[in-house]
Amino acid sequence: MHFLKKSIFLVLFLGLVSLSICEKEKREDQNEEEVDENEEASEEKRGLMSILGKVAGNVLGGLFKPKENVQKM
């Protein structure tokens, strides 16, 4: 009976340890996925800001551009 108790406790302990390791790896994988998603979103924002900056530069450049004198005949 004593041998059976030790065996059961050993099996339960090893099962809990392996479950704990699997949960830890799962959390790490989820964190990596979140980091990847955040990096992709950041890249998209940088691209959008670059385009908006160019458009704003063109618009503002057109507004403050000196107008040419046009003479009518």
From Swiss-Prot:
Record bears the keyword Repressor: no
Pfam families recorded: FSAP_sig_propep
Keyword Plastid: no
Predominant place of localization: secreted
Subcellular location: Secreted
Keyword terms: Amphibian defense peptide, Antibiotic, Antimicrobial, Immunity, Innate immunity, Secreted, Signal
Propeptide residue interval(s): 23-46
InterPro entries to which the protein is assigned, alphabetical: Frog_antimicrobial_propeptide (IPR004275), FSAP (IPR016322)
GO biological process: defense response to bacterium; innate immune response
Signal peptide limits: 1-22
Source superkingdom: Eukaryota
Residues covered by region (Disordered): 25-45
Bias type Acidic residues, positions: 30-42
Tissue: Expressed by the skin glands.
GO cellular component: extracellular region
Function: Antimicrobial peptide with activity against both Gram-positive and Gram-negative bacteria.
Family label: Belongs to the frog skin active peptide (FSAP) family. Frenatin subfamily.
Name under which the protein is recorded: Frenatin 3.1
